[in-house]
Design a protein with these regions (language model features):
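Long, ordered, helix-rich scaffold segments
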Residues: 1-227
Length: 227
């Protein structure tokens, strides 16, 4: 219904019929009537994703409706899975939920993979509400750390776009306050240096030869001691 009754702004033509905002409101109200806790995990994901599609197609809801959606979803954020946290962080940030900055930065700091970290950083990039200087500092410090992450050909540009959007969302006062941090250049290290830091503190066991490892692997790897 959202796709049929509303066309997103990026693909809208002058000849297209006007957005059916009444249908958009009905979709949002129907979602608000659902009991999140009674839904299965896959249904919860579908529910939040439907909110996203509806808001892209019909535009940001009124403050009253936005507050209702925030009240419905914020109680379940953070969730138990990355997939749900990603969608909730993205949706609540779009609605300018007052707690999403703190919760999102906490998830960003705890995320164990660069992929998860990138999604949280991307979701928070346009958020303007709920920030403190400490949270902003943690957020922009992440961009200094991620300079040593690795990805495909467009990886660096993708991160640059996220950071540019985040800087653009700052007020003039915030830009002035964070100026030293925003001007700081990341220390880019070689893959060998990054690996050496990751291995720091580990005990040297043995300088293995390829022939030794080949023999061990051919015997099977069951009942190994990882201690």
């Amino acid at each position: 219904l959202a796709k049929a009754a509303g066309i997103d702004p990026f693909h809208r033509k002058k000849s297209d019929p006007p957005i059916n905002r009444e249908m958009g409101n009905k979709i949002l109200q129907s979602l608000l009537e659902l009991d999140f806790e009674k839904l299965s995990p896959s249904e919860q994901l579908s529910m939040v994703r439907t909110y996203q599609v509806a808001m892209v197609r019909f535009g940001k809801p009124s403050k009253q409706t936005a507050d209702q959606i925030i009240a419905q979803l914020d109680a379940h954020f953070p969730a138990k899975t990355f997939e749900m946290n990603w969608l909730l962080c993205e949706t609540l940030a779009f609605l300018e939920a007052p707690t999403v900055a703190k919760k999102g930065i906490s998830l960003l700091n705890k995320a164990t993979t660069q992929e998860e970290q990138m999604e949280y950083a991307r979701s928070l990039r346009n958020l303007k509400s709920g920030w403190t200087n400490e949270l902003r500092t943690q957020y922009f410090n992440w961009f200094l750390k991620e300079a040593n992450y690795r990805g495909g050909a467009s990886f660096t540009k993708f991160i640059e776009f996220i950071r540019n959007d985040a800087v653009a969302s700052l007020s003039n006062a915030e830009k002035k306050e964070l100026a030293p941090l925003l001007a700081q250049k990341a220390e880019v290290k070689s893959p060998a240096e990054v690996m050496a830091e990751a291995m720091a503190g580990r005990t040297f066991v043995k300088n293995w030869e390829l022939e030794e490892l080949s023999k061990i692997s051919s015997r099977g790897l069951k009942e190994r001691d990882f201690a």
